[in-house]
């Protein structure tokens, strides 16, 4: 039994007040600097909505509470957790327009605009979507309106006040870290509209901190090689889609080789890029052990992306000799396998042979390789062209479980 159940209302109000004050004190929308404090508040608030514990509490609006918790996680860079917290909710569940707009942004637009019953909310959501697709002034206009409403203290009720206060912070975060802003700043010469339109279908409005860090490190500007180390599930796959799109936009005649040293990974990539290609207008083919090695030259000529294990590509290399100079980008996935006694030799040998061809750029990906700078230098890149992030989309807890004996 929770010690504060007899004063549950007071404790909950204290949590809301604490959240409000932390956000208000945070300058320049740098909410990540207050992560530890805000996570504690979010975890305490989540207790009020958990199925196991919510029966202990009465008088708490659990729907709104979920939104507040999701907002905190969104602001500190845990968008995946925020989306999970809101799963099963509907934009029309919320009683104020600011709360509905918070839901729309934090969930990545996880609703059909035509399903939004409140016309003002629908209009605001359309303004945000229009900004994402065109880069117009809609976001600035909407942000100015919300800030002015908050400053002039014009609210319908207490819920409207609190939700507007949260929306101010959500809009500030969104304005700073949305896809359109980050991509245009990193590469203003590329038309990102189709890529952003595809991202909207995946309910993605912004990059994860690890992805944004890689872009700011030069992912979209490197000349020869860029190496990226980030934990599993931190967004490496989305990074490859981004770079493939940029490469084909910059050079429509380019070909891209995606080296996946595991057959299971090759099969997974084959299915994924078949779907991605339909959205981004490129074709892909895959060759790997267990699949056919006979690829019609016309089909290969048509394909913009070739997915292969290093071993399979080396078998086909002689028949692909004329095609080799067409590859302008090579993506090296699971790069830590270069150190594998079984697969590393073939992987390293193939990369050594490809390095002799001028004009090829390399994106090297790994979750755990320790000497990422040295690998990037070996590929011909600079030591600075490296993205190294320890960000994970959700915290990981490690524990030892023992039975009958003491591990210590």
Where are the regions that the model predicts?
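N-terminal helicase ATP-binding lobe
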Residues: 1-408
């Amino acid at each position: 039994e929770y010690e504060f159940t007899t004063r549950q209302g007071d404790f909950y109000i204290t949590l809301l007040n604490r959240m409000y004050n932390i956000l208000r004190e945070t300058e320049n929308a740098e909410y990540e600097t207050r992560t530890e404090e805000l996570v504690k508040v979010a975890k305490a608030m989540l207790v009020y909505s958990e199925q196991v514990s919510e029966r202990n509490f009465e008088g708490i609006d659990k729907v709104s509470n979920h939104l507040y918790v999701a907002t905190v996680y969104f602001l500190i860079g845990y968008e995946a957790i925020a989306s999970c917290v809101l799963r099963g909710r509907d934009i029309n569940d919320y009683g104020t327009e600011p709360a509905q707009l918070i839901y729309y942004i934090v969930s990545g637009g996880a609703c059909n605009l035509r399903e939004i019953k409140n016309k003002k909310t629908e209009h605001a959501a359309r303004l945000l979507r229009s900004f994402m697709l065109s880069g117009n002034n809609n976001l600035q206009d909407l942000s100015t309106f919300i800030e002015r409403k908050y400053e002039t203290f014009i609210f319908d009720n207490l819920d409207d006040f609190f939700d507007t206060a949260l929306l101010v912070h959500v809009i500030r975060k969104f304005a700073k870290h949305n896809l359109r802003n980050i991509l245009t700043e990193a590469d203003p010469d590329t038309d990102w509209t189709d890529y952003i339109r595809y991202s909207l279908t995946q309910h993605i409005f912004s990059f994860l901190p690890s992805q944004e860090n890689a872009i700011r490190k030069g992912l979209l500007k490197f000349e020869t090689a860029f190496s990226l180390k980030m934990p599993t599930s931190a967004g490496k796959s989305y990074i490859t889609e981004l770079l493939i799109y940029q490469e084909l936009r910059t050079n429509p005649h380019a070909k891209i080789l995606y080296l996946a040293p595991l057959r299971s990974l090759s099969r997974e990539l084959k299915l994924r890029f078949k779907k991605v290609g339909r959205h981004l207008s490129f074709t892909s083919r895959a060759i790997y052990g267990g699949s056919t090695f006979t690829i019609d030259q016309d089909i290969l000529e048509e394909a913009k992306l070739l997915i292969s294990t290093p071993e399979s590509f080396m078998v086909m290399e002689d028949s692909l000799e004329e095609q080799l100079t067409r590859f302008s980008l090579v993506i090296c996935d699971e790069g830590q396998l270069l150190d594998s006694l079984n697969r590393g030799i073939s992987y390293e040998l193939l990369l050594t042979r490809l390095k002799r061809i001028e004009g090829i750029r390399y994106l090297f990906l790994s979750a755990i390789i320790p000497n990422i700078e040295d690998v990037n230098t070996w590929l011909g890149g600079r030591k600075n062209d490296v993205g190294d992030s320890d960000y994970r989309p959700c915290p990981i807890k490690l524990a030892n479980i023992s039975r009958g004996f003491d591990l210590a």
